[in-house]
Amino acid sequence: MSDICDANKLKHRFRGYFPVVIDVETAGFNSQTDALLEIAVTLLKMDDEGMLGIDKTLHFHIEPFEGANLEPAALAFNGIDPNNPLRGAVSEKEAFLDIFKAVKKAQKAADCHRCIIVAHNAAFDHGFVSKAIERCDLKRSPFHPFATFDTATLAGLAIGHTVLAKACMMAGIPFDNKEAHSALYDTERTAELFCYIVNRWKQLGGWPLLAAGAQDAESDTEE
């Protein structure tokens, strides 16, 4: 099979987009005012059989930006103490420079033309990521400015449940609720869920699509 029509290559699976799984932990719901406190980024790879899997994960604790709002309820929910020196937190800019470097390298290796964020309830994560990039005045973001793959939506379609923990368990992916709301843990479970859905769709015959010409030929033969 030629590279041009090789459906088992990642660059052909999502129209040239390289999926990057992201989860953030924050000090509230407002991306403009509330601090980004933790981020994890999981890179994916596709094997020779066209099956998607986890490659590696980057993880950063983030220092609240100057003047950031810290909602007590949000901190109680995720258990993060922004002032704990043991967090080893770095600035938003330092984290995103490292993230940009890693995802651009992976995107190039996969011969894709742009990265697209995969997240559970993706609008939330995409909003905080985009705002942090804007605050840091970073240019040439690898991420699509508005398009995302939302695993809550995909799981609702493929599995019948939208809650991450429940969807994972229904897909046979172990999920420990005690570990939840850690960006590192949630990102890797989200990545496993996304890979499960993509791979299951392939196994069921949904991918690759038959070319229009092949479909027409089959129709002519049947007639």
Curated annotation (Swiss-Prot):
Its cofactor is Mg(2+). GO terms for molecular function: 3'-5' exonuclease activity; magnesium ion binding; nucleic acid binding; RNA exonuclease activity, producing 5'-phosphomonoesters. This is Ribonuclease T. Binds two Mg(2+) per subunit. The active form of the enzyme binds two Mg(2+) ions in its active site. The first Mg(2+) forms only one salt bridge with the protein. Its EC number is 3.1.13.-. Keywords: Exonuclease, Hydrolase, Magnesium, Metal-binding, Nuclease, tRNA processing. Belongs to the RNase T family. The record marks F29, F77, F124, F146 as: Important for substrate binding and specificity. Mg(2+) 2 binds at D23, E25, H181, D186. GO terms for cellular component: cytosol. It comes from the Bacteria. Mg(2+) 1 binds at D23. GO terms for biological process: DNA replication proofreading; tRNA processing. The active site is at H181 (proton donor/acceptor). Homodimer. Disulfide bonds: none annotated. It comes from Shewanella sp. (strain W3-18-1). Trims short 3' overhangs of a variety of RNA species, leaving a one or two nucleotide 3' overhang. Responsible for the end-turnover of tRNA: specifically removes the terminal AMP residue from uncharged tRNA (tRNA-C-C-A). Also appears to be involved in tRNA biosynthesis. The lineage of its organism: Bacteria, Pseudomonadati, Pseudomonadota, Gammaproteobacteria, Alteromonadales. Residues 20-194 form the Exonuclease domain.
